[in-house]
Amino acid sequence: LGHTGGTLDKLETIPGWRASLSNDEFYAQLRSVGAVICAAGSGLAPADGRLYSLRDITGTVESIPLIASSIMSKKIAEGTAALVLDVKFGSGAFMQDPARSRELAETMVRIGKDAGVKTVALLTNMNVPLGLAIGNANEVRESVEVLSGGGPADVIELTLALAREMLALAGQPDADVEAHLAGGKAMDTWRAMISAQGGDPDAALPAPRESQQVVADRDGVLVAQHALPFGIAAWRLGAGRARKEDPVVHAAGIDLAVKPGAAVKK
């Protein structure tokens, strides 16, 4: 996924956690825990892999109808009854142009509804990095911080917005998502999900062998913080891959100290 990173790469920084589940394991965990994050099995939407290979050699990787069908074919094949999509735009997103991101979101919502799946999409801005962490272990660490009741305000805001949409589609529009987050229920589910997939939720995440601090060269206010250069820098450090078979350095990444609008000192 280049500079955008992959969800499974991030979760695989957790010692013991496994992404591959059989169908029986998937449904058993969904019933017992209520949450699963796993890799799509090869038999889920087998035509998608072949179509992607064709897109790669025909210059149609950025075709919105083909992107939408690739994403939605897997979601529909899962037997999903309701689906919430987080469609990002901006310099740090796969689809940078807001108009094209909106077109992609509308296309996927239409496909979902045509297939009988209750589908909504949120358009979210990735011109500025989300949160303060960039990289695999870094972002997992920040996610755990949010589940513990802390973390950056923008990550909390997006998390709550997505949760509200999910619960509304599930017939629970009045559920108090803030209370579940603050009261520890969300963290309990996270720990149960990680444990069910072989991971240790208490294990230390990979730490870098060395680090370098970048400081302000003058006093002032940070007025801009473009996501793309940070993503590329983390990718070059090893947090992403250029080819599917490339290894990922789990501890590689960047931790930001401030967001735009913050005062900095030399």
Name these PLM-found stretches.
Residues 1:
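Active-site nucleophile and cofactor-binding loops and adjacent substrate-binding regions
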Residues 60-63, 67, 77, 81-266:
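Well-ordered secondary-structure scaffolds
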Residues 4, 12-78:
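Phosphate/pyrophosphate-binding betaalpha-module
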Residues 5-9, 40-41, 48-52, 94-99, ...:
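Short acidic, glycine/serine/threonine-rich loops at helix termini
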Residues 9, 28, 73, 110, ...:
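Surface-exposed charge patches
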